Amino acid sequence: MSQTQVHSHDALSDHAFEDGVPYEYFDAARREDPVRWIEEEDGPGYWSVTRYADVVAVTRNFQQFSSETGGTTREDIGHEDLLARQTLIDTDPPLHTAMRRVLSPRFTPGNVHKEWVGFVEELVQKTLDQAFSRPGFDWVADVAAVIPMIVLGELLGVPTEDRAYLKALGDEMIAGADPDHAPRTADSPENVKENSGYPFSSPAGRDIWKYADALRDRRDGNLGHDVFSLLMTGNLNGRKLTTRELDNFFSLLVVAGNETTRMALSHGLLAFAQNPDQFRRLKEDPSLLNTAVEEVLRWATPIHHFRRTALVDTTIGETAIKAGDKVIIWYASANRDETVFDAPYTFDISRKPNPHVAFGGGGPHICLGNSLARLELQIVFRELAKRVETIEIDGQVHRLRSNLTHGIKELPVRLTYA
């Protein structure tokens, strides 16, 4: 077994990501110590897994590395709190399989295409028309945050007037230590601990639960074809979902159906602005759209990491792992692994193959909504290539202070139109 040095969590803290992903750190870690022990001031420490092959192996091996035991976020949560906030991503098979089955028929590629192509195309046209009425605007506020939130609202059957409120709660729930989006918990470990029973240890998680309860009361007896109605009537191992299970499904969808797609749209636009040759290629050859979207997903990697907990004594690579050890798998590092991706720091819209882990590394936890996210990205960037000649960044790019999610808060742009 390899001898592993001890490292500080400081290099991987929320603050370390505020100016961008610390790729140099990850590059060195993959070369020198791909499974390294990180000390925590607020916990027992964890194994930091940075190499693509190891990230994929851990992600797929739920028999040895659990999402249910310990949850999927770095902080250590008590057992009762974990059960209270348990979502689809915080379970292992067979419970995970049963929970996923409640919604999976609605998210197959065929059903997504049939139900959503027309709606998303019309929405994208309308949103771009409004944004493109002026040469300069904030891509995040005016496009990237608008489209996924409206899609999510339609998906869940959330009234139009409530969607901005849900967006704000979703922003806060996953904002980590960012003072703009999470003022109630930013740089306040005490507040995080006080809210550990709510999704992402955030008071916004509590507020989303309350909203879901109120929506359920309003919808009782007035169900439709939306996913919230499906949750209210869904079958989980022969029974209906409990109130808390429904609340947790709802909170997860608010994040997974909105925040991560917004991040990919934001980083994709930034990548095209910084690589005008690739934008020109897409304009000249629309057949590159699908590979372009996959490269945007690799480039963006909306979720930096997730946690697993070792269930047995085992190994990752050549490193011995003990039962009960916390393991952090870094998708942000895996998607820049030079042993898998040629020229990983080159944004190449024709990259093929492109086995990125933006939706997870395979196995039972592959992102349920990946087909809908891809559809939104494809339509936005297809229309962008048709309607825009050049993209320039027109001010400072403000990033989210978070080591969990790869968010951009503001992206001022100036476009010239075709």
Predicted features and spans:
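Cytochrome P450
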Residues: 1-418
